[in-house]
């Protein structure tokens, strides 16, 4: 329940204003707990001082990675320890062993290899030296059997052409840092999904393919399952693991690796694929950028039930069941179909455009809250990717709420309540549209497509934050004023 900020302060003398500083605030009170400079103000030095990664709150201390080493502070600001492990970008902690792991980016030292350091509870380095890993580390998981590390070579997740990227999976001995596998399993592409399961690890490849390996690195499937490219969804269902890619969908038996449906649902490659579950009919509803399908969860029998065209060449971003009807939307488009795919309405409102949009931040509060959740999950020792149950509201929102409920403070209890609200079906869609007078904010009913509320501002470059959970609009009305509207 702390907010940690690093940068340069605007107050103080000239030397203080150009010296990097860290400040810690209490989220419950909004008051500053303490602050400190990373170097002595006014002191001439050739060393660069800066915070290099996210700070972590753990074991009644705040651990801060900097360009000159890792620093641990008490909540009152006392320095508990510091070491010389420089340029750590990511910190992970293990509650069971009271151990700290830090990842140093190879790019910061002109290397193609990232480096992993292990520290004890007092910041002392536990391994003789950091363990070098080929490529950029994209996934780091602490398990009871060892440390699983996925790294991406030749550009990794930031590469434009996914086919040029290839991942490696390593499994390290937590005691020594040595690789426990004589031979790493073949990936033949970029690892897009990576989950710990009961008997090993399950992973999906961006170029297509799903495989499961044991904790000793052996394949548990007879052969990797071939899938379409870009696996957008991997989730558990009563029938097995459902996967949805940019061009196909099926369910896998996780014990055998065989598909449950005799034939996969195949469709023309789509930039966006969204899905939901119709509990009443026992069908998955899958929507591509132009076509909607209904699939029987048990047999895999499917049929195309609707086709559509989004204005402004938008792609669907959300789908949900509204009773027996199907709601499909993007930023500026809203569709409602009955359960047979017959169109009930289509509403479209022209977007403000890039020049008019300014710094509008739709859903910024929800995004910030999700990022905070991910950080707290790592701090709590739950730094594992989550293979959730496929359900009507989605596993991620449910996990967000569960994570905060385990943190016993008023601020996080309030956050849990907000996430519970986000799990519940919302009845309206909020969008911005261009009007003759400026930019208008519309609140529309998902069930009817009708306008429920409207707000227009003459500001050509408005700054908004919309809290879609509690239905508030925060609007910067001038340089010193933030106005709040109930929407």
What does each model-identified segment do?
Residues 1-487:
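Secretory-pathway ectodomains
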């Amino acid at each position: 329940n702390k907010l940690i900020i690093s940068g340069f302060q605007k107050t103080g003398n000239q030397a203080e204003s150009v010296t990097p500083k860290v400040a810690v605030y209490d989220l419950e009170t909004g008051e500053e707990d303490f602050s400190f400079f990373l170097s002595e103000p006014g002191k001439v030095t050739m060393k660069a001082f800066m915070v290099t990664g996210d700070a972590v709150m753990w074991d009644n201390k705040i651990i801060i990675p900097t360009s000159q080493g890792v620093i641990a502070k008490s909540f009152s600001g006392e320095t508990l320890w510091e070491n010389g492990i420089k340029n750590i970008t990511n910190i992970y902690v293990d509650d069971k062993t009271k151990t700290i792991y830090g990842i140093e980016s190879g790019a910061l030292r002109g290397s193609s290899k990232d480096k992993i350091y292990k520290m004890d509870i007092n910041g002392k380095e536990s391994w003789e030296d950091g363990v070098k890993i080929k490529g950029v580390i994209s996934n780091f998981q602490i398990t009871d059997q060892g440390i699983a590390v996925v790294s991406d070579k030749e550009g990794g997740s930031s590469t434009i052409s996914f086919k040029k990227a290839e991942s490696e999976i390593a499994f390290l001995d937590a005691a020594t840092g040595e690789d426990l596998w004589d031979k790493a399993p073949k990936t033949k592409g970029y690892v897009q999904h990576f989950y710990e399961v009961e008997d090993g690890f399950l992973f999906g490849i961006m170029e297509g393919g799903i495989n499961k390996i044991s904790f000793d690195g052996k394949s548990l499937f007879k052969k990797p399952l071939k899938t379409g490219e870009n696996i957008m969804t991997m989730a558990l269902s009563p029938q097995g693991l459902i996967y949805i890619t940019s061009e196909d969908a099926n369910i896998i038996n996780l014990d055998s690796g065989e598909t449950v449906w005799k034939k996969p649902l195949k469709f023309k490659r789509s930039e966006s694929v969204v899905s939901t579950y119709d509990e009443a009919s026992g069908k998955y509803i899958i929507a591509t950028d132009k076509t909607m399908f209904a699939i029987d969860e048990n047999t895999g029998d499917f049929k195309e039930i609707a086709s559509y065209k989004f204005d402004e060449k938008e792609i669907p971003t959300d789908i949900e069941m509204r009773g027996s009807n199907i709601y499909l939307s993007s930023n500026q488009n809203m569709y409602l179909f009955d359960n047979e795919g017959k169109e009930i309405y289509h509403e479209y409102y022209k977007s403000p455009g890039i020049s008019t949009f300014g710094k509008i931040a739709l859903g910024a509060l929800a995004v910030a809250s999700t990022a905070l959740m991910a950080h707290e999950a790592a701090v709590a020792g739950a730094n594992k990717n989550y293979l959730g149950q496929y359900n009507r509201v989605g596993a991620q929102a449910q996990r967000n709420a569960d994570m905060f409920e385990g943190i016993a403070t008023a601020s996080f209890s309030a956050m849990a309540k907000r996430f519970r609200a986000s799990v519940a079906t919302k009845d309206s869609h909020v969008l911005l549209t261009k009007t003759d007078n400026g930019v208008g904010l519309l609140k529309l009913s998902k069930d009817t497509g009708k306008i429920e509320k409207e707000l227009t501002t003459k500001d050509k470059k408005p700054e908004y934050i919309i809290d879609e959970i509690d239905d508030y609009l925060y609007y910067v009305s001038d340089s010193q004023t933030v106005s709040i509207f109930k929407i």
